[in-house]
Amino acid sequence: MRSILPLSILFLLFVPFLHAEPEFPLTADSQPLPNVPKGTILKDNYTAKEGSVFPGTQRDYQIYLPAGFDKTRPAAFMVFQDGVIYQAPVVFDNLIAKKDIPPLVGIFIKPGVVPAANDNALPRFNRSYEYDSVTPTYSQFLLDEFLPAIEAKHGLKLSTDPNHAAISGNSSGGICAFMAAWHRPDRFRRVFTGVGTYVGIHGADQLPVLVRKFEPKPLRVFLQSGTGDNNLYCGDWWMANQMMERSLTWAGYDVNHAWGEGGHNAKHASQIFPDVMRWLWRDWQTNIEIKANPKGESKWKGYEVVGDGVWHPLQLPSANDAAALRMHHMAANQNGDVFFAHEFPKPVWRHGPDGHVNSYAPGVRGAHKLWSIACDKSGLPVVCVSGGEGIVRIGEIDNAGVMNRPSRCSEGLMAFGGGDITLLTGMGHKQDDHEPFAEGDHASVMLLDQNRTQQHSIFLPAASIISGICLSPDQTQIYLAQRDNSFITSVLIKTRPTPPDDPFAAGQKDGTEPALAEAQRFGELEGSKPETGGLCVDTNGWLYVATSLGIQVCDQAGRVNFIIPTPKQPYDVCFGGKDLSELFIACGDTIYKRPTKAKGVVSGQQPPIKPAPPKL
């Protein structure tokens, strides 16, 4: 025992050294070298004005200008969060001299701080709010406020070509850099994150999933982390970075990584920074463009539906009309005609299967607001308006016929089935559109026919404004979107005996009528407040929902499988065009369309279609 005890004590003394963080010595590229032209550094500060997304914040910044910099030409540049990191100015000097990277302008920004009100108060530290957020707020600040301000102040001309712009950061600065490029790939396409905070502080833990669901973006990304990275209340940095790398690889991104045994610091990232820069800017002299899915290896589910097409804006008959338009509602018929109109009634336009847009009919006389538009079983557009006739069928040019006068109009309207049942409308808004629902209020769905105000209605699980409504392809379920929550509600359509005292019972051929039953939340959309709009389905049973994140596409089980980004926020979506194979979105002042491999279903105008069951 006397010989064993000292050995045990000696082992315990060495245990801390066994777990010590490895050293990461800098290479020659990160140290000043003789005979290498040196850039210059400008130091300044910036105070955000009232009206900024970060009002009152003050921040220091530094600007690196490469040797021989020409201010008259648009410059490639790289933005860093948390000021100067990774020995970047020295690395820039050395790599620019070797022509490994272009002559970059370096912009090193500190996070914002609002000064304390007095000596007994704390400042408002904005770093986490600015950096850890997954919203586009920081990219808005950077591109709309900060960069234009320093360009004007220092006489700079930064390139607006996204292939000429990179962005980087460490820890929370890393997630900030990634999100700036994610939201604005039209301005940034090269990203380096060291020990990136892809964890649950302000929602970044959802990014590995969103990377798989969103259509791949044209980004080149390098990630660094280590086994000794943070493991805290909000997540495990080491595991989160690996999940990000796996998701980016799965989605077909141009991605690289460096894993090590380091902790939550900039040591490893600083060591590899010169090689990271070479990788990010490789081929910059011969092929600088970065493309989405460059090797064609992406497993993004959306390629099976929309391919690699792009959105195309429609040209309205008069360009002057578009500036003041709020086109939030669309509908299509089985011929492929797509009808759309201004929210405050003006002419109804039609996009025909031949691709031409023409004025179809004037606005409804006396109407104050158009709430929704659908096509009836004959293919004619039907609108629901307030301040006018209620629900109105619109024919060519001047033929309008009143169909019904509901007590309230709705943003959900669609054609339904045969017989006398031609319309289904979701009733769910207050008389004052801005008045919130109170406790005890309910949203509801009601069936209407041409002869009666209401045939059957059902309350929904939550009180919320209905923003969209459509039938399943087999016409046995109604899908409803509600504006201020992230759920899709399903309502079953069943049959019930027609009441014997119903004066219209003689018109029912089989003694039954449709009834609504078993309403429940069915699908959940991505995003805490996705600002949901209209929705539609295709023959495979996929459900397409217009949201502020883009078009979210759910499978037959209600799961969001992929998200199609849109040029602007879409308020409605439908299939139209030749063979109902084009996807249309209404984005306020613009209607866009995109070719797809799918074939849409228009509610109530086609025989029921039974889709295949959902897969994993």
Identify what each model region corresponds to:
Residues 21-293:
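Non-catalytic cap/lid and distal C-terminal segments of serine-dependent acyl enzymes
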Residues 214-221, 492-572:
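Glycine/small-residue-rich hydrophobic helix-like segments
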Residues 290-311, 439-440, 499-514, 602-604, ...:
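Blade/loop signatures of beta-propeller domains
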Residues 296-300, 310-347:
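Beta-strand-rich domains and repeat architectures in extracellular enzymes and scaffolds
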Residues 317-337, 364-390, 405-430, 439-444, ...:
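Beta-rich, blade/repeat-based domains predominating
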Residues 347-349, 390-395, 443-446, 487-489, ...:
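A short loop-to-beta-strand structural motif that recurs across blades of beta-propeller domains
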Residues 351-355, 397-401, 449-453, 493-496, ...:
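Short loop/turn segments that connect beta-strands within beta-propeller blades
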Residues 574-616:
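Blade-level signature of beta-propeller repeat domains, shared across WD40, Kelch, NHL, RCC1
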